[in-house]
């Protein structure tokens, strides 16, 4: 293609064209003249005018076909830009009009009833193949829900916290004390020990030890008292004036029943039976009683040498069975504890030695039985060791013939009631045991008679003989049930003026100087002086003789594991404790962090209880049990097992077993009513911070459990509550289905008396009751007050929309975008049917019982909401939410804030056909003609154009930013190219 001509060439070419056109139309000029004229034009000096230059400029711009096409392309692009700009401008104008158009009005409070008649086929009896449709009438009751909110009963009371108090309790469990209270045998004691160890070990296996900032409980006076009271409360040391043993090997105590199995009435096992010498008729040859039992008689009791040691100087006993009348077994353990402490404080003077008036007359000439009682006649049966080791004299109660020189011939003289007893029929009307001896002299001497050659099995003939079937002869005689020849003789054993020490008082004094650990260590060793701990013996048998013991014992330094000091101990770091708590999942409102709230106890309202609430509360388990002394052995163990298992279960669930905490004491300290205490006890939480075994032996065990309690003190308790269930409403506007819900400022409606209160809860936990830090009283949504307007949230949903929730009363909560069973669409309704029917593809069943109206149903103020026309589209755009309130001013404010988001549609960032169709739907109610045109364009682009271009056309939506960038670059290049065609200087050609 030839390049464009220069200006001179173009002017000459233009003149030659004009000359050629002029010469073609004339006949007067010859050919030679024409050639001459052309040559003159070519040789003529050209002087271009402005008009020539302008025309030449136009020539250069369109000199070639490519330049013409470029101009055409540029014009088309400019035309498209103009058209698109006009379209966008018109669309923006239309969007602004659509925004300002008000949409639907939501108005709840609609109640209606319908009779639904589904067709149900019924088989005719005469034709098994024929089925005929018959109408079935189903009554459907529909009640719309005000403001789209359903209220269901909230059964849990709502408790508002006033403050949180922390409280520590140390629970001590000593199986020996429990066994003594229940009078258990050694075999049952072992079972009890195993049971306690099993339950406590299982609790310890799932608990971790950590510290609380309340100090070491072992430095607390109450802990020291409880610990030592549990170990040494009834332990005493008696010092003889001069060591003297029991004078004889034998003991006559005919007032005690004999052992054995007898028909009829049986007696409880007596401790003295351990020393009974049974009468046996088969003995070795030449066997005598003296050879084995000394002066003791067969059929009586033998005192072993261990109780008759010559050099025994002290008696150590741990028993409550020698106390005088002030100690009543019918009292509770706490009452007896209080009485005992008062006695010990009054009967000691800063030392562990008891005053003389605390002792019985038999022990001291100045005794007044202030603490201990006199030993009675029957004590030898149940407490033989106490009589043998502590009595200064003994009165034998004998029914043996020959004692006191009583014989059969003298019975009539000794007992007036027996005068002439054997000479008349009086004996037929008296007791068969009356007026005779228990043991009669049958032989002149005791001897054995053997067969020839027999030395091991010979017949033995005792000096006294009588059938043992009369096992309760002496006891009945002592009760004076019949006249008998009783011989009572006094035996002087040892001198008076005993000196008695209280081990509990010794602990009280020594622990202040040496510490509780050292004192416990020394005194426990002292109780184990003979190899068997005295406090682990049965109460009635816990009496042992000691040979010159050192008392008070020495108190060596005992290294103890401190709980508060970090020096010289098995370090349990705080960080490790926190890590353990987190790993174990403890969450007692922050576990250890909550312990800092113990400072709340400094409230002035609790001044009288500060020292109690701040220190550890020490509790003995045996003091909290029922009276187990009336139970038999296994029943007492089962009773304790039930208590322990319940305690363990409660602690694992972080609850409090109030059996072991005095709620009366706590109520006095907190000054709360009974109803408030019920709530406090119900919502209180517990946390075990240590479980340890403090003593272990085959027949006894002792444990300590450290418990931390978190007590929530209520400020207010809301009852009769209703829970808010926000269902919402459906709105279809601008071709979009929208789920609209009101953001109510409350979660609970409370009805107290006649006042309805709307509550907003903050920082709540659910522990049986709902416990909240903050509860605010707010106003409901309504048109009456500008301050009560509530935001409305809109969310785009897809059609069809069906939401059916069955309610507890047998009704159904329905929200649907369509109608079925004459249930209205868009409106949330409570539907109740009287027969089973199918609606929305689901079976609606009648309630099991007739529907009952509640006495109180929350009532809300009437509320009408007018929503913007484009509320559905607003909600659909990238999840944007618009807040719409019930006042017109608020709506305008919300619309202004939403305009910026709505006008983003002008800068299209999505699928073009969908955007145009959305615009058409929004314009339909405002400008139907424009909406039809836009709908047609959108349908063409999404339908026909999609079919023509296929996937490539749809990809343009994703490649649009790239294509626009490339197009802009090409357009700039084209413009620069066209500009370069314009001559800026004279060309030589």
Curated annotation (Swiss-Prot):
The chain crosses the membrane at residues 66-88, 962-982. The record marks 25 as: Not glycosylated. The keyword Zinc does not apply. Glycans are attached at residues 109, 141, 183, 286, 311, 346, 391, 405, 423, 528, 557, 783, 809, 834. Keywords: Cleavage on pair of basic residues, Glycoprotein, Host endoplasmic reticulum, Host membrane, Isopeptide bond, Membrane, Signal-anchor, Transmembrane, Transmembrane helix, Ubl conjugation, Viral envelope protein, Virion. Residues 1-65, 983-989 are cytoplasmic. It comes from the Viruses. Changing residue 572 to T: Complete loss of processing between SU and TM. Residues 89-961 are lumenal. Changing residue 14 to R: Strong increase of subviral particles release. The mature envelope protein consists of a trimer of SU-TM heterodimers. The N-terminus of leader peptide specifically interacts with Gag protein. This specific interaction between Gag protein and Env glycoprotein may allow particle egress. The ER retention signal plays an important role in establishing the intracellular site of budding. The surface protein (SU) attaches the virus to the host cell by binding to the cell receptor. This interaction triggers the refolding of transmembrane protein (TM) and is thought to activate its fusogenic potential by unmasking its fusion peptide. The transmembrane protein (TM) acts as a class I viral fusion protein. Under the current model, the protein has at least 3 conformational states: pre-fusion native state, pre-hairpin intermediate state, and post-fusion hairpin state. During viral and target cell membrane fusion, the coiled coil regions (heptad repeats) assume a trimer-of-hairpins structure, positioning the fusion peptide in close proximity to the C-terminal region of the ectodomain. The formation of this structure appears to drive apposition and subsequent fusion of viral and target cell membranes. This is Envelope glycoprotein gp130. It comes from Human spumaretrovirus (SFVcpz(hu)).
